Amino acid sequence: ITTGLLQGFIDRANKVFSGTYADDPVAVDSKIRFELATVDVQGNELATPGINRVEMGTPAYGEVAGYINKNLLWDPNRILNIWVNDEIYGTNAYAPAYILDNGTVVPGLKMNSVATADEVSFTSYSEVGITLTVSSIFSINKGGYEYYLGTHFGLMPTVFSTYSGIPFVNGDVDFCSDTYTYELGPIALEKNTYSDDKQAPVIYYNSCNIMDESSASTSLTYEQVLRMRKVIANCPGRMFD
């Protein structure tokens, strides 16, 4: 794993989040940008930009997660934590766990309300970051991983499935009316829309939204950006400056 590999991921993500990766009529600029960390949370310079390597030999099952929770939960309001190891439950991202008790609602997410961000003490990697497997990291700059960034900032999948437990509300599953809801089917770029209105037309399209699985993963919509901005403003652990 090299700085160059990670920089490729950063460069792609920044183009997607700025709406400049592809000529997409619905893509917008989120004003969110990522960069590789050069210092740790104590202000010490990292030997390799973007990388904090930890040698653990051959850890027992569960030891890696315990070590991360105790030593490697860097301030999530300053640093996007991404851990790479095959011992921590695969490639995954987690929705925000907390929200300020100020009347703000992020539909579809179940969060604990707190009066201030200072009340929150993060104790688990699942509250603050993203996990990747060793094998997955080597394709990180080829696209698709923006899905995990979107999940981290409160976006929801755009697929309808009777098995997901996510309700179909007002013709939508992700609470963003400017995204297509597609029907679960074969793993492919080509998708078709889903509706509970049997008279509604079916639209066939090549998917490009970051929350479409098996997508070109090149764009965000306006309402998705509004949702992420709401999360950044109100959800401790996601409150970047």
Segments from the language model and where they lie:
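Pan-zinc metallopeptidase signature
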Residues: 215-241
